[in-house]
Amino acid sequence: MDYLSTTSSVLHPGSPIAAAGPSAKEDYALDGPTVSIIIPAYKVASFIDETLKSVFAQTFTDYEVLVVNDGSPDTEEFERAINPYLDRIRYLKQENRGASVARNSGLLSARGKFVAFLDADDLWLPTYLEAQMKFIHERGCDLVCADATFFGDTANERRTYMDTLMNDAPAADDVTFLQLVDAERSLITSGVVARRAPIMEVGLFDEALRNAQDLDLWLRLARSGARLSYQRRVLLKYRCRPDGLTGDAVNSHRRELRVFDKIEQSYDLSPQERGKIIEVIRNRRALLEFELGKLHAAQGDEVQSRESFARADHLRRTWKTRVALWLNRVSPNLLKAICSRRV
């Protein structure tokens, strides 16, 4: 790993300890930053300037910023973009090994008691860190995930992540292992602030997983007894782009299925937990087949579309699969038009 710059942001007086409550004082380091912001970067030269501006606009200022270049092919352009910030960030470079390794590099180099993850194309609102830290100390939790609005390459512009993709996510109280398993989508990594110690204790991100390593970590944290909470306040903007870290719905379901398969095969599960995992795997396979059906329909492949929708319907019968199969039969062109809309 190449430390091109190891200069960290200067710690500022006046961190909002009082706003977080008297019990929070022990979490504010005297010899280092309270929060380490970890930003993995791969092919984001055109986005990183805006992202860093959102970081340096934070009302909470007791932080350091670690930017980890994951062997990006646009490194020359990327380094030009971050050059104005080199005296305010710690810049780490590594060979391309994936987001999990990049985030772990940041975690191992971090000096803060808390870590905040941020993808290099997402944006925080100015009060993001202040609100997240206040929530953690008021609730006594180990991890909090805030809500986000979509922007970029999406038809869900200005809608929120949790309302769109996590309707079953609890609005209050701690998130249990089974609730996290049952949610249709994982926490937003760019919306997570957490105590660093529990993450180190459960073994960081699984570097064997090229994708969905964030979901895997949240599940291990919940299973270990760490307290995870949702904050329904919209505190960030979640960029949608086809080649981003998040990817499309088909790949998202495929990635998360690998995590649930890992859980079923390697966790010492209770009968209740095993039953729930089996149910979730079946439902996720249904969601994957439904998204594949939409993809085939958008491409005009009526046969493959019908077969995928039929498999989804067999795994979990819903009104959506019924309507999709009906449209495939009576009006494939209308189905194609509907499925061609970007979600």
Go through each PLM region and give its residues.
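A conserved hydrophobic helix/loop-capping motif in glycosyltransferases and polysaccharide synthases
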Residues: V35-F47, T51-L52, Q58-T59, V68
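Conserved nucleotide-sugar donor-binding catalytic segment
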Residues: L108, D168-L257
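Cell-envelope/extracellular polymer assembly enzymes that use nucleotide-activated donors
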Residues: P33-S36, S54, E64, D216
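Acidic donor-binding segment of Leloir-type glycosyltransferases
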Residues: L52-K93
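Glycine-rich, basic loop-to-helix element that forms the pyrophosphate-binding segment
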Residues: E77, Q94-A110, A131
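Short aromatic/hydrophobic "clamp" motif used to bind/position activated sugar donors
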Residues: V115
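C-terminal subregions of glycosyltransferases and related glycan-biosynthesis enzymes
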Residues: D2-L30, L228, C240-V343
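Conserved donor NDP-sugar-binding/catalytic core segment of glycosyltransferases
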Residues: T127-T160
